Amino acid sequence: SQHGIDVEAEVMAALAQEITTEIDQEILGSLGTLAGTAIDTYNQATVSGTATFVGDEHAALAVLINRAANIIASRTRRGAGNWCVVSPFVLTVLQSATTSAFARTTEGTFEAPTNTKFVGTLNSSMRVYVNQYAADNANVIVGYKGPGEMDAASFYCPYIPLMSSGVVLDPSTFEPVVSFMTRYGYVELTNQASSLGNAADYVANIGVNSTNMKFQ
């Protein structure tokens, strides 16, 4: 401990945060794979109609998100998509549509992304999350989570969310080392032999063409 700071505690907290982030990214990657091929691709250059300003073209992305949500409703017969995960780039697109029809149906204000976090609500029903580590052209993942614990696309069940061994000495080098362990189960009900096999019906991907995107 120097200057009133417990270095050991700071390092362990940082490592724990990194492991938590890795788990988040693993789950998001699995959901994106489960969703499969994108059902639509947002391309600003092909938006129809005459836009009065760039935000009108950006608002077209909300239409595609709504379409994906309604497709999920027709697949599952449970409900429309009520959450989505976007990249910081797509979050910027949503932010720039503040004076379009999209903004008038959005509750609250968007926050700057700091991790995979809740940033706003679309159409008073869809919770929007941002994945800070996603690339500009990363798909938008739209999904449905019902009121019950079993009404979802996949299930993350941590037995031990995160456990630390504390600082111990390596018997070979006598260097201080620390170990972390996590135990969890992750399942997607895709096997029709043992379940309905409809996990993929709960999620959908929307592609994003970021190469010709304009913000002014």
Where do the PLM segments sit?
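Long, well-ordered alpha/beta core segments of mature domains
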Residues: Q25, S74, P88, M126-V128, ...
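Secondary-structure transition/capping motifs at alpha-helix termini
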Residues: T21-E26, I72-G79, Q216
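Alpha-helical scaffold segments that mediate packing/assembly in large oligomeric complexes
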Residues: S1-Q2, D6-R67
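Extended, solvent-exposed, turn-rich assembly/linker loops in the middle of proteins
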Residues: D40-F110
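Sequence/fold signature of self-assembling virion shell proteins
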Residues: S1-H3, V7, A13, S96-Q216
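An acidic- and aromatic-residue-enriched active-site/binding cleft used to recognize and process polar
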Residues: T20, S87-F89, R183
